[in-house]
UniProtKB/Swiss-Prot annotation:
The keyword Ribonucleoprotein does not apply. InterPro entries: Band_41_domain (IPR019749), FERM_2 (IPR035963), FERM_central (IPR019748), FERM_domain (IPR000299), FERM_F1 (IPR041155), FERM_F2 (IPR041046), JAK (IPR051286), JAK1-3/TYK2_PHL_dom (IPR041381). It comes from Danio rerio (Zebrafish). Its EC number is 2.7.10.2. One of its GO terms (cellular component) is endomembrane system. This is Tyrosine-protein kinase JAK1.
Amino acid sequence: MPELAVMDLGRQLCVKMKKQRKAEMTIPTAMKGLEIHFYLADTHQLEFFKACYTAEDLCVEAAKRCRISPLCHNLFALYEESQDLWYAPNHVFKVTDETSIKLHYRMRFYFTNWHGTSEIESPVWRHTLSKQKSVLNSQKTTEGTPLLDAASLDYLFAQGQYDFLRGLSPVRPTQTDEEHHEIENECLGMAVLAITHHAKSNNLPLSGAGAETSYKRFIPDSLNRTIKQRNFLTRIRISNVFKNFLNEFNSKTIQDSNIGLYDLKVKYLSTLETLTQGVGREIFKPKNLKVTGESEGSPAQMLPLGDNGMGYEVQVYGTTGISWRRKPAPNQLILKDKPKSKKIKGDKQWNDKKKDSGWTLFSDFHEITHIVIKDCCVTIYRQDNKTMELDLFYRDAALSFAALVDGYFRLTVDAHHYLCTDVAPSSVVQNLENGCHGPICTEYAIHKLRQEGNEEGTYVLRWSCTEYNFIIMTVVCIELDLCESRPVPQYKNFQIETSPQGYRLYGTDTFRPTLKELLEHLQGQLLRTDNLRFQLRRCCPPQPREISNLLVMTTDREPVPQKKTQVSQLSFDRILKEEIVQGEHLGRGTRTNIYAGILKPKSDDEDDLGGYSQEVKVVLKVLGSGHRDISLAFFETASMMRQISHKHTALLYGVCVRHQENIMVEEFVQYGPLDLFMRRQTTPLSTAWKFQVAKQLASALSYLEDKKMVHGYVCSKNILVARDGLDGEGGPFIKLSDPGIPITVLSREECVDRIPWIAPECVKDTANLTIAADKWSFGTTLWEICYNGEIPLKDKKLSEKERFYAAQCQLATPDCDELAKLMTHCMTYDPRQRLFFRAIVRDIVMVEKQNPSIQPVPMLEVDPTVFEKRFLKKIRDLGEGHFGKVELCRYDPRGDRTGELVAVKSLKPENREEQSNNLWREIHILRELYHENIVKYKGICNEEGGRSIKLIMEFLPAGSLKEYLPRNKAHINLKTLHNYSVQICQGMDYLGSRNYIHRDLAARNVLVENEGTVKIGDFGLTKSIKDNEGYYTVKDDLDSPVFWYAPECLIHCKFYRASDVWSFGVTMYELLTYCDASCSPMSVFLKLIGPTHGQMTVTRLVKVLEEGKRLPRPDDCSEQLYNLMRRCWEATPEKRIDFKSLIANFQQMLDNL
């Protein structure tokens, strides 16, 4: 080597040595406060002093600094490198004068192959509606939108470089020199990518980039140290080879293929996934690990791990979930080399070895129901109650682990749910309270509004996808389409600004302290936009497991929407009648009889097809031949149970058709129904026992919710006890049985009888049966469990039960506030506000921690039949008689004009004393009656300390037939009139079956609910008759509707059931004349008897009737129908047709129309 060159090299070495000494002598100044550092070279750290900050708030500030969008913000977290600790989003940093914390802002939640360049792993994307539609239609389309925005990709690239160089992502281990050489070349290839990216991003010339930049800055420190140990000539050769390769790469590959910065980043990061170990994975090394499972026959069993759970590690991986394995020995090769072969084949073998490296999958994120943290111990619960318990070395590590699983759950399963209250982000908690979504895109907001019915004033709240301090309110507005002359929905977006002062609608001046207060203010205003006026009416809050662009999807995890099972798709195992033996009668279900039974073993030839090797005790639910009309609904229940496979649901063996009977064959569960089991116990059941039952039930319902399946009748009598757990060994074990006959085929009376288990919306319309109905039922069942199987509302009549819902009453809840809150969240009258079953399980565990004391006897519920005078708001008079009047009122206890309309009957002041007994009698009668063709009793309202009373009834806005028929004559045909007649007869037949006679049946007292339904009203003259007498003698001197009365009523003042039949004949005459005043019964009879008044009217009327004169045949009335009317007007009561025969005759006529 020439002397000059040697001297020059010597000077360079001296300069390096001086710089190194100077760096060693430099003492950094001690930092104060809290600093957040970034990996982007041009981004200065954030500094915070004396205050309290949550990790989530700090992450928002960091995201703003790095221009990361709100959509990608939840991929990041704060990391303290010196402690190797990630902080949970709700962690509070208390910064004082003595605080010195250095944090790094890092992407924590990572999904390998997010770039989609690997042909081996499933691609990752954000969900889109087009993807959702393609799944529904089984079409193959392009995947959804990219996971990362541009700023997140830039940051991940910088973070990836930092991790690669510092060894935070160590390269995969090697065994041979050849493998080591291959790794070394790949690392130099990474340096080529990094230097090229550096040159292009800084507008430096690509040619000669290697001469200006040393490759040593872009390879791992460990490799640098290895190269330094080699001789000088080897280092020179490596440097020259690298420069030549870099120049060739830049001059040919980059320029010829038009490769940009994005391509370089993706190639760098995708290579990092295969070159290193641990990218996208976090590994925890607990002091102790337990994995347990639960079975029916025995308590929870710990899976054999050995070493008492020590020596194990747990991995959390974004694309698969949670796994565990035994720690590998220090000298054991865990992940072997990436083979030298073709790229795809090599990657496949490498990935296979990674999968085969001893990891046992515990759970994917969608299988997790909740997480519990106690000190340093974290317990993860799956839907099947299998658990993993990690005992970590300190609590911060436990919180970090829980926050990691919780974060991945929100990214892959439900963006608006948290698994653990100890690490719940405050933003998620507040969003749930406010009914606000995360930063979903406009496409999903509009899609949701369409699903909700596109009602005007319906709106969706969502955080902005681009700005951190704005909430977007997307509202449905109705606009007239001038071309088609029809109203069409339009979707308008309004910005709500958030700031330290509160919330305000963008463009206005007034801030409100909370979002809820702002919305309450806006709902009272008339809003305008683009010449449209509208009012906010209903918010559409986030729903469990909603699909949106907030969710990260892979092909393996792609959700398959559950469709309602079609009749042709009904599926269950068939059992031959010879294979079952029917035993003793166990009781009755809804339209079924229940028997004990035996399922015989099948022949040897059938064993391989699911036969039974020995006799099995079963329960037989028999739908008799008299209910063949609901056989299909019965089979639907069986098909639903056949699709369920959960250890806390009863097993359905199959269905047997025996002659004309259909039989559901279910497993026999030892201790029978839960309600009876609880009532049988002589010693009080412990709170822990009750909570275990509640958790098991909620886990089964969570499983059904994930499968988009509705049970339909959750109650304690449909929960079976398989293990009593009274000896303290493992606790109870329950199974949810089938719901029986679906409510969709039950009568209204049967549905009302199921109050308070049936959800209120299902009482209104059984078509409203959804998963939300099961949540209401669970709330009621939890009440039963708390109170040892007591029956809620057991003393209430059907009308009172219905009123309980109409008044939106609640069951009396236990003293424990948290337990009461859980029940009311399940039993809110708005189905959209009910909790996700995962949230129910989580909250049960939280309440259980408090070990609440539950008093055995519940308090009395609020009586829904008692109305408070101050909440009755009169709207108008409906009618007036001699002694009383009826008013239309709104009962509005909330004072928000949302209360129901009711008809209020009261006595006139001058008649109160003498007529109060009659009004009380009418109240007592109405309380006893419940029929779809009789006006419903709602309650009473006491005034003046009880001296005055009001009768509250349902309001029917169409009025009486006397008013309705003349008004709608053009739209009402003979068939409709026949239908009305049938309904009146059905109501009167029911009245007679309860030993009542109406005494005032007329068109004026038949009210119209809708064009297809009428109801009998005004029971002011109704009397009760004794079974052995059959009639009632009137002793008072009330004004009577004489022209509707039968002769025996006019002559002897005796009233029979047949007397009501006479009045019905007159009423039918009114219907056929459409209540024309010119030919009303009074007008016709007055023409027959001539001018008269007082008692003489009754005398002359009796004479005309005794002569056989009757009302004439109305126009368009057939002879057959008129003959039926004449049979109602037989002179002697015994000869008159009865209501049952009238119903049959009308049904026959209807069939012939």
